[in-house]
Amino acid sequence: MPLFRSRAEYWAPFLGVTFNRLSVKDQRTLWGSCTREGNLNFSWRLALAPDPVLDYLIVHELSHRAQMNHSRRFWEVVEAVCPGHRSHRRWLRKNGRALHLAQR
């Protein structure tokens, strides 16, 4: 989906990172993932989420290019670019199930 690529291309320079392939899949257990090779994968259902939530997930996965973990340093990287990330995470916890009810 062009939406995901354009948002990743927008946010990557803010984080000082690059990425390789970007795939949008029918993921059921993860919203997104980042491989050590820099490949990004996202659930197509994120296209149904509010734009700030989609952007948070993209920033989250791109941040793994700097920190391949969920350490304090990782969250500092996310926070520097997406200071509202906690509210976006809450939105996903509250509304994520409804996104999974959507059919392609």
Task: Give the predicted meaning of each segment.
Residues 1-56, 65-104:
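Active-site-proximal or metal-binding-adjacent scaffold patches in catalytic folds
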